[in-house]
Design a protein with these regions (language model features):
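Active-site hotspot residues in diverse enzymes, especially metal/ion-binding acidic/histidine motifs
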Residues: 1-309
């Protein structure tokens, strides 16, 4: 399970200013954002590769230079890494080229492309990609640059604060997420992420992406110890409900969801305990799009304590 992380305020401000310059250069467009217009503005090239036809990737990796130094003296190592790590996209700074895996479902191309555009906009990412020391290659460093690229992608695809303003003006229900998904042309999963983050700065909100929760619909890949692929915490939820586990939340979701093959699987009021031991009521709603199960949980009120006489 992947818990959502939060970019530091200073870095977020820097990234956001770079995204604003891009959108300003495009004349602050209406949604959905056309990524081909972004590529044209930034003079980025887009190509596709597939694991079963690596010829193009072989050619590219043979030509990657920084100055006069060839970064990948053994291009086969990069190709092997792409295969083993299941990389779905790649940005080549010196050639200003984005590579997308054509085997990935088309619905995911948009996010993957925006993620690589995010890398291209952040100069310190390009420095890290060019480096070869231990700090550059550390897992900690990798997680940070991926987090920042995701933040940049979200601010770009959702047109910075425009999405935030629209999300906060709508009902805190899954129907709003579906409406915004249509308007902005992004996937339900990425729209759920942004919706949770935008409406949950002061109110605790949680989102979950998992497989079908009903016991009769679970696949052979279901992992009872890690049932959630993503556990999305709004800033307020992360601050006040840091001890809530994915297992606890998934158990609550499973309790009210039906075995339907698509659409709304159910909704219910769920009790979660904050970091001070106080129970709170959340309204949970779960939707299944036949690929992923998406859950939105919104804080309603503190639970009333029983009165004894």
């Amino acid at each position: 399970m992947t818990k959502s992380l939060i970019v530091s305020p200073k870095t977020a401000k820097d990234i956001d200013s770079r995204i604003d310059r891009v959108l300003k250069g495009l004349g602050y467009p209406e949604p959905p954002l056309r990524l081909e217009d972004v590529r044209e503005l930034l003079r980025l090239d887009l190509r596709f590769y597939t694991a079963d036809n690596p010829g193009y990737l072989q050619e590219v990796t043979n030509r990657i230079f920084v100055g006069t130094k060839q970064v990948f003296q053994r291009p086969a190592l990069l190709m092997d890494a792409i295969s083993k790590l299941s990389l779905q996209a790649l940005y080549l700074p010196d050639r200003k080229r984005i590579l997308l895996d054509d085997n990935v479902p088309k619905l995911k191309h948009r996010w993957n492309e925006a993620h690589e555009i995010g890398h291209s906009l952040l100069p310190w990412h390009q420095e890290m990609m060019h480096g070869d020391d231990e700090n550059t290659l550390s897992q900690h460093c990798h997680e940070h640059i991926e987090l920042e690229a995701n933040f940049a992608a979200a601010r770009l695809l959702f047109l910075r604060d425009r999405f935030t303003e629209e999300a906060r003006a709508m009902a805190e229900k899954f129907a709003s997420i579906k409406s915004l998904q249509t308007a902005y042309g992004n996937t339900l999963s990425t729209t759920l992420y942004r919706f949770v983050e935008c409406i949950g700065t002061e109110k605790p909100v949680v989102g979950v992406i998992s497989g079908h929760p009903h016991i009769s619909k679970r696949t052979d890949k279901f992992d009872a110890a890690n049932p959630c692929r993503h556990f999305i915490q709004s800033p307020a939820f992360a601050q006040k409900f840091s001890n809530v586990s994915e297992l606890e939340v998934f158990k609550s979701i499973s309790a009210y969801c039906g075995r339907q093959g698509g659409g709304i699987l159910g909704e219910d009021e769920v009790f979660l305990e904050d970091d001070n031991g106080q129970k709170h009521i959340f309204r949970f709603e779960t939707f299944y799009n036949r690929y992923d199960c998406l859950t939105l949980g919104v804080h309603l009120a503190p639970a009333k304590s029983p009165i004894f006489f």
